[in-house]
C-alpha cells in the first residue's frame, strides 16, 4: 500500500517502470530514516461551534456527540530532507515528497485503526474539506497543544509541512474515554 500510494502521489501508476518503482522505494527508505512521527489526540464535544464550523463537518459528525481531534507530524527532519533533495534533484525531491505524504497517511491510518479497536469512528475530516474552513487550523492546533509535539502554524500552513489535523467522529453507541 505504501509503495502504491507513493507512486500515486508522484503521479505515476501501478504500471510504472522498474526505475520509477525503485525511485519510490528509495524515497520511502529515506523518509523513514529521518521521520520522527508523533501525534496528539484530544476529545471534543461535537457541538463545539468555535472549532467545528460548517454544514459538512456537522453532517460528518451526525450520530456523534464527541469526536477525536488528531494532530500528527513526521517531524522537521522530513522537511529538511525534502529541501536538501530539491537542491540536488527535483526528480528525487518529488519522490521524497510523495513518500513523505504516503508515510504520513500510513501513520494516521495506524492511529485510526487503534482507535477503531475500542470505538466506532468516522473517517478523518480535515480543515479545508468541503466547507470546513481552513481558518480553524490555528485554533485546532492550540486546542490540542500542538507545541508539545513541535507543530506550529504559519497562516494556515502547518510546520513541519508533513503534518495533519483531523476530526474523527466517535459514534455515540461505542464511545470509550481515552486512557491518557
Language-model features and meaning:
Residues 88-147:
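Internal, well-folded beta-alpha domain core
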Residues 78, 104, 175-178:
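Residues in flexible loops and secondary-structure boundaries
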Residues 30, 49, 59, 66, ...:
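Context-gated lysine
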Residues 43, 47, 82-86, 108, ...:
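Generic alpha-helix signal with a bias toward terminal, lower-confidence helices
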Residues 121-180:
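Short terminal or interdomain "cap/linker" segment that borders an active site or interface and mediates
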Residues 1-88, 92, 96:
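Active-site helix-to-loop segments that bind/position phosphate- or nucleotide-bearing substrates
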